Design a protein with these regions (language model features):
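N-terminal beta1-alpha1-beta2 submodule of the flavodoxin-like/Rossmannoid cofactor-binding fold
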Residues: 1-41, 45-63, 104, 117-136
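Short histidine/acidic/glycine/proline-rich micro-motifs that form metal-
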Residues: 44-46, 78-83, 113-117
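Short, glycine-/small-residue-rich phosphate/pyrophosphate-handling segment
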Residues: 51-52, 64-108
Length: 136
């Protein structure tokens, strides 16, 4: 999906939640409104979310008052294994949930020590993600 960056033009505020940027975000917002559960996932880049996830979160401003009562799950991966390496990433996810009325956070999975493609396969986070998915 293609998601452009928020321009902070607030066209959405003047047009009932319709963004001036014509990309895939309108479809994503429709799906977020319709969903009961939202899973946010990102690799950790410089102790934060990646640019694509940041763009999605920022563009949610167009309908932040209509996206409500959601259950949130978070999945993060990082090359480092430290306990605090994902704190800022988690805060970015939590920040979105805090802005959406009635939302609750249900689960967090941290895949630590993964850098190369496929490394996650042997980590406990892979099984945790599977188990969490079965519970949703």
């Amino acid at each position: 999906k293609k998601i452009g960056y928020c321009l902070a033009c607030y066209h959405c505020k003047k047009s009932g939640g319709v963004c001036a940027i014509k990309d895939d975000m309108a479809d994503i917002l429709d799906k977020m409104n319709a969903a009961d559960v939202i899973v946010m996932a990102s690799p950790v880049y410089f102790y934060s979310i990646d640019a694509q996830m940041k763009a999605l979160i920022d563009r949610t401003v167009a309908q932040w008052l209509t996206i409500r009562d959601k259950e949130f799950y978070y999945i993060m991966t990082a090359a480092e294994e430290g306990d605090t390496v994902m704190d800022c990433t988690l805060e970015c996810f939590c920040g979105l949930a805090k802005c959406l009325k009635g939302s609750v956070e249900r689960g967090v999975i941290c895949g630590k020590g993964v850098y190369e493609p496929g490394e996650i396969e042997s980590k406990p986070a892979m099984r945790e993600a599977y188990d969490m998915g079965r519970q949703v």
